[in-house]
A protein has these predicted regions:
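N-terminal substrate-binding region of glycoside hydrolase catalytic domains
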Residues: 1-58, 231
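Short, solvent-exposed loop/turn and secondary-structure capping segments
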Residues: 17-22, 82, 88-95, 166, ...
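Active-site-adjacent "subsite" loops/lids of carbohydrate-active enzymes
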Residues: 31-68, 72-73, 78-141, 271-278
Length: 278
């Protein structure tokens, strides 16, 4: 095919392989976590964890294996990291096996703003330093673990594009810019150790205004040289009228790196088009 770059999602606060920052997705911690009466959901999570254990016994790291396979097929191999995944932070499900360690242990770090769509009340609040520090630590761990494999690291800000309380995005944008700078510094450190350049990319919203509303000052990121390429997209549902030309026009000469726009495809019930944030 004409595909040249393969990106594997490494999750967010749940992990597909062992991490010092939390347990593997589906681990019920020796039977101490369940999913209430929803045995189907519980069994689904447990199935993933059993598969993980089987691979682990064979010495197979799921992320490493997948990235190596992509490189064997002649593609660039990237990790793409969900910056604030909201799938697993709904306490009304009464399903503890869904909850990540750091999230359930620190409700004081929740955004508590339900106006931004799906599960946004339980989103991590990036205005809090401890949240940003943890994200940097997780990303740093992945960079170190897969430094000899990856060609690049992608920050997926569209999963989910909720970072600050409504109306406070622009004033908090410098905090997110500093986080991206810190990640860039870590990537550069790993690149120097490897003796080769590891690329940095980000997936963001389709317009400059939408990004700034959410605290993502992409103009400043490019001015500071924090990214090697950028992509725009929507959250899950496809948009046949993606404003690619508008993005180019808004960015002007500041768009000095390769720019891609994604094709997204997903099904929603009618009410979800707006409840899911975009």
């Amino acid at each position: 095919s004409q595909v040249t770059t393969y990106m594997m999602c490494s999750g967010s606060d749940f992990f597909y392989v062992r991490s010092k920052y939390g347990h593997v997705m589906g681990d019920d911690l020796n039977g101490t976590l369940d999913c209430g009466c929803d045995t189907a959901q519980y069994n689904s999570f447990r199935k993933y964890y059993r598969n993980h254990l089987n691979l682990e016994k064979e010495g197979t790291d799921l992320v490493a294996y997948t990235l190596k396979r992509a490189k064997e097929k002649g593609m660039e191999a990237f990790i793409t990291y969900r910056m604030n995944d909201l799938h697993f932070n709904d306490t009304t499900t009464h399903c503890p096996i869904w909850y990540t360690d750091f999230w359930i242990q620190h409700p004081e770090y929740w955004l508590n703003d339900t106006t931004q769509g799906y599960n946004s009340g339980g989103a991590f609040d990036f205005a809090i330093k401890e949240v940003r520090d943890r994200k940097l630590a997780i990303i740093s761990e992945q960079l170190e673990n897969y430094a000899d494999i990856i060609d690049g690291y992608d920050l997926d800000f569209m999963r989910f594009i909720v970072y600050f309380k409504s109306g406070t995005g622009p004033q908090n944008a410098p905090l997110m810019t500093q986080l991206v700078k810190d990640i860039r510094q870590k990537v550069d450190e790993i690149s120097a150790k490897q003796g080769r350049k590891i690329l940095r990319s980000a997936r963001v919203a389709p317009t400059v205004e939408q990004n700034m509303m959410k605290g993502l000052d992409i103009r400043e990121w490019l001015r500071l040289g924090l990214l090697d390429f950028i992509s725009t997209g929507v959250h899950w549902r496809g948009d046949p009228a993606m404003p690619v030309a508008k993005f180019r026009e808004e960015m002007g000469k500041e768009l000095n790196i390769p720019f891609y726009s994604s094709i997204d495809d997903g099904g929603y019930r009618p009410r979800e088009f707006w409840s899911h944030g975009m």
